[in-house]
Amino acid sequence: MLALRPEHHDSITLRIEAEPAAEAEDADDALAGAEMLTLDLTVQHGDALKAAARKALPKQKDIEAWIAPALFADAQLNVRFVDEEEGRTLNHTYRGKDYATNVLTFSYAETEDDPVAADIVLCCPVVEQEAKDQGKPLRAHYAHLIVHGALHAQGYDHEDPAQAEEMEGIETEVLAGLGFPDPYADR
């Protein structure tokens, strides 16, 4: 389903369904036992984001394709692309850090049983500079950070080494399945 939200000229709502991989003897058995996951995805662009910057951003269908294999539950996600000022304001307001960061995830689930619902905010100038500094294609860096944000939305974190290893392993596996290199290979 594709629906334009007329009250937001810069938003598109897209609903997709994905099937998690299942171990089965053949494809028919796998499909019969597979649970369908649903993603309600909205993409927004900050008002101050310049038109030239918007042209370099991933398309809705790409974002959908990157998030789907990283989902382990139904999800309602909003991906928002912002300029440096909005990114810095959000990081300062919600994390007490007075600088723009590459990605922020605001998860609205209060318990593990709550549905996955979150805003994933990407600061375009920071993402672009990081990709340049790290010698990575911008598309690959956006894919990585969007998958990273989707995992945060589902409760994954990287506060300690064991958590980081688990989360980075999932990111690497998802990105490899999408044809992107290991984002942590150069460490």
Swiss-Prot record:
Its EC number is 3.1.-.-. One of its GO terms (biological process) is rRNA processing. Binds 1 zinc ion. Its main location: cytoplasm. Keywords: Cytoplasm, Endonuclease, Hydrolase, Metal-binding, Nuclease, Ribosome biogenesis, rRNA processing, Zinc. NCBIfam families: PRK13963.1 (NF010570), rRNA maturation RNase YbeY (TIGR00043). This is Endoribonuclease YbeY. It comes from Ralstonia nicotianae (strain ATCC BAA-1114 / GMI1000).
